[in-house]
């Protein structure tokens, strides 16, 4: 600004002999210099006063929020008789972390839960985000001899509620089998129920959650019902065999099969 002022003062010493038109040209040129100087000065101040402007702002990319996998089940999911870190959903989380997948596992297992009890508490569970939902209920119904039609109705209600609240969520149904204590027909109908539900709802199915564990004393606790530490590892493998397909479909990438401990 001092430079511009000096230029204007210098006009006083311009000889009066200059033609009026020439003096006008000089005055116009100096005016343009003045306007440009003021504009640049204001821009400098604006950049200084606005540290959040594009010129000064550092772009920081925040990590994407993790997707949620909910395991909704009974004592097998809850890890009855095991340390918390030995339950199969925790083993699934470890597998996911080893592959650097952006998912977190929520263990919503409750010991002794029936399909009716699950249907009663599902609304509370659905208050949190759900991207993948694994339904593991029905075993306690079978042990109590609850009619298969009633169990199926409750499981269908749970599936309907999940789909209604989170239509983009992917569901996985864990199949279960029961010994023929209640009769062979009951055992057959019970086993078929899971296949029917999976087909009717177009969802993934784990044919038998306890494959390789059920009836094997080596992999069960003393009660002969709940998996021990080694049994839980096998259950995790059974679950991962289906879950990885769901995640592969969502992420369109390859996964290594199996577990390593």
Residue ranges and their predicted role:
Residues 3-28:
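Bacterial N-terminal signal peptides that target proteins for export
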Residues 28, 99, 214-216:
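Short hydrophobic/aromatic segments of transmembrane alpha-helices and their interfaces
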Residues 36-39:
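C-terminal motif of bacterial Sec signal peptides marking the signal peptidase cleavage site
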Residues 41-43:
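Bacterial signal peptide processing site
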Residues 48-111, 117, 121-129:
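Serine-esterase "nucleophile elbow" of acetyl-processing enzymes
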Residues 119-261:
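Alpha-helical cap/lid subdomain in secreted, periplasmic
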